[in-house]
């Protein structure tokens, strides 16, 4: 479904709310095999909740949380802040942990195996959610990278798969228990967003057909 065709989308005028709506509903730039469904992410209230916030923030700018604008020009951090806000305030969601570190047993247990981006409850189901939000490009769509040439799409894809697999490790389950979260019945899911840029403005067939391009 193309959520941008929803008539309510075009009633959203506040820049931050439109950014949040894009983060919630955009198609994935690549598939991980465990995408979080947009309907699950939006919940029952969906765009109507966004519309209510839009009207409130337009009429009273002081109601917009300051932390949602401080990282606007750092794409990854901005996306993290927006999603954390949604998990904290949407009525169908509950944020249990964010950026939860997972430590290994080497060097006295101080080595970091990774972080779990979010542990959140959505519609009564517990999720370990990993977020990736990237702008990548190349002339042909092959070997895509960000502004830093070492920040390749392939590298990010591999890292994301490792992060999604963290939940199954004993170390991650111990970290969850230490945080007061029972690791049973938690599902790993991804939210992948972004744009792929090529000289032709289109993406190769290996990308999802609805992925955003430019």
Label the model's feature ranges.
Residues 1-214:
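Intrinsically disordered, low-complexity Ser/Thr/Pro/Gly-rich regulatory segments
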